A protein has these predicted regions:
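Short pre-active-site segment immediately N-terminal to redox-active cysteine/selenocysteine motifs
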Residues: 29, 36-39, 108
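Non-catalytic, surface beta->alpha helical segment in thiol-disulfide oxidoreductase systems
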Residues: 102-152
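Conserved redox-active cysteine motifs that mediate thiol-disulfide chemistry
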Residues: 35-52
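Catalytic lobes of large eukaryotic enzymes
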Residues: 2-12, 56-62, 79-81, 86-88
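A short beta-strand-turn-helix
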Residues: 7-31, 56
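Thioredoxin-like thiol-disulfide oxidoreductase module
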Residues: 71-121
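Cofactor-binding loop segments of dinucleotide-utilizing enzymes, especially the Rossmann-like FAD-
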Residues: 35, 69-71
Length: 154
């Protein structure tokens, strides 16, 4: 897996909350690439946890950018699912979706990879890293700091 290509495979124009956004990997120290789909029950279970993590991580300053790569079967599903997400997403039907799935040999979803902002793979099992530390009442700043510190040490 050639992780340095991640920043080249993500299209410059991504979908954000308020329309099209120009992608810049340097906007945060860490870049997460999240492969998921509306129709996938494990994804729908993990997405709220990741959203909570993302919001706590970025509360004071931007530490993490996430790019969603959809496996949704229709644009309606994609739009409904991305409507619940605070991060960026590759537009539905964009060729980058297949290119990213192929490059990272995605076998199943949800799949969450974490890179530094230069494209170096930091955590191939970022879903497990985030999910295994999920407290009952949601993430605290301390829990998130612990995970960020783990990633920073790599």
């Amino acid at each position: 897996m050639n992780s340095t290509i991640v920043v080249e495979l993500i299209p410059e124009d991504l979908k954000g909350k308020d329309g099209t956004v120009k992608f810049s990997p340097k906007d945060a120290p860490f870049l997460g690439v999240y492969f998921s789909a509306h129709w996938c029950p494990p994804c729908r279970g993990f997405t709220p946890k990741l959203k909570n993590f993302y919001e706590v991580a970025n509360k004071e300053k931007k530490q993490l950018e996430i790019v969603f790569v959809s496996s949704d079967r229709s644009e309606a599903e994609y739009n409904e699912y991305t409507g619940t997400m605070p991060w960026l997403s590759v537009p539905f039907g964009n060729e980058a979706i297949d290119n990213l799935n192929d490059a990272f040999e995605v076998q199943g979803i949800p799949y969450f990879l974490l890179f530094n902002n230069e494209g170096k793979l930091i955590d191939e099992k970022a879903r497990t890293t985030v999910e295994n530390r999920y407290p009952k009442n949601g993430y605290t700043e301390q829990t998130v700091k612990t995970i960020i510190d783990i990633w920073s040490s790599k």
